[in-house]
A protein has these predicted regions:
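Short hydrophobic/aromatic-rich beta-strand segments that constitute the beta-sheet cores
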Residues: 25, 53-57, 87-91, 110-114, ...
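Helix-adjacent hinge/juxtasegments
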Residues: 63-102
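Hydrophobic core residues within well-ordered beta-strands of beta-rich domains
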Residues: 19, 73-75, 129
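Mixed-charge, glycine-accented linear interaction segment located at domain edges/termini
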Residues: 120-151
Length: 151
């Protein structure tokens, strides 16, 4: 895998240098309590020279032609690299949920498991989750599975 280390990137983050940038794509979402849906997303990883990546993700529900119907979700967070290829990730959702994730990376392959979660009184309660990220054919691939609302 060939990539450029961004200027000023903290050395701890070199293994995640491939993630830095803006990624756009489309996907499909499913959950037992709602109808399946198609979405478009934009994911941004950037840095300010400190030992964490800033993370921002937003998505939109799209129609069959790929046109935006309405906003869907937003997340912000921070990604930290720890010894032994361990990641610690904090993510807050616009819906009132904040999660702590722990996982590992192996080159451009990342697996995270939800370690702890907080839900605001008006938010759904998320009890578990798994996130996978990877570089596939030059594109950011990700999958997000969650357990919430008793499902």
């Amino acid at each position: 895998m060939v990539f450029t280390i961004p200027e000023g990137l903290h050395p701890d983050l070199n293994p995640l240098a491939w993630m830095v940038g803006t990624w756009r794509g489309k996907g499909r979402g499913e959950y037992p309590t709602i109808p399946a849906f198609e979405f478009a997303s934009e994911v941004v990883f950037n840095h300010d020279g400190r030992n964490f990546l800033n993370y921002f993700s937003r998505s939109w529900i799209i129609d069959a032609e790929g046109e935006i119907v309405r906003p869907a979700s937003s997340e912000v967070g921070f990604w930290r690299v720890k010894p032994n290829n361990v990641l610690e990730v904090l993510i807050s959702h616009s819906t009132g949920i904040t999660e702590g994730w722990v996982g590992t990376f192996d080159g451009p392959k990342i697996q995270l498991v939800m370690d702890q979660g907080y839900s605001a009184p008006s938010a759904k309660i998320v009890t578990a989750g798994v996130r996978l990220y990877g570089l596939v054919a030059g594109e950011l691939f990700y999958a997000y599975d969650m357990a919430a609302e008793g499902q």
